[in-house]
Amino acid sequence: MKDLTLIIPAKNEAESLPKVLKELNSFSVKKIIIIDKHDKETSRSIQNFYCLVVKQKKNGYGSAIIEGIQRAKTKYVCIFNADGSFDPKYLKKMYLKLNNNNHFVFASRYLKDGGSHDDTLLTFVGNKIFTLLGKILFKLNLSDILFTYIMGNRNYFNKLKLKSNDFRLCVEIPVKIQRKKFKYTSIPSIERLRLGGKKKVNEFLDGFLILYSFFRYYLIKND
């Protein structure tokens, strides 16, 4: 996987990120880009690791992903969490799927052999509803639309012209992939418990924004 860059947004992840980077030492990726929102504690915690730390310019999870992709140079990029919930053992399988004529590969907690140790009833039900909406409104062939463990061809990521600066990015990515008729597939994965820190998602506020974005993309075809 010498042509793969991992994009890791990191906000208040000093407890978990060093453990994540230590685990990633066992995997042969070309580069790891940490998008740091001026968090001195997190930056200090990873100063002995080989990675590129980029200071985030705009606020939000989506902005961190977009800025990370813009800094990448490799053929492939993968969105990866700083909290330890994404298991890197799936990277190789996703990479092989990309090399089998796919432009994007989504990890899914809800395919057979997938699962989650971090889901709550609220996030489970919400994800099922949003995934169903994706199928109905956009004919998306996905089982886990809110899980952003996504690997893709960098040139095709750039063609999406992503704009969302928050968690609405998890809807924008698959909707634009579908509209542009890019090839994508999914693999089962198990979401682990986070290694430290706190969740950044506000289930109610972010859920409302995601719902709004569904209907916005449905009504505005060229956005």
Residue locations for each model-derived region?
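Acceptor/aglycone-binding surface of glycosyltransferases and processive sugar-polymer synthases
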Residues: K57-N59, S63-R71, Y76-I79, K89-F167, ...
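Short, well-formed alpha-helical segments that are part of the catalytic scaffolds
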Residues: N12-S26
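A conserved acidic beta->alpha catalytic loop
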Residues: I35-R44, G84
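Acidic helix N-cap motif at the loop->helix transition within catalytic regions
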Residues: E15-K19, K40-N48
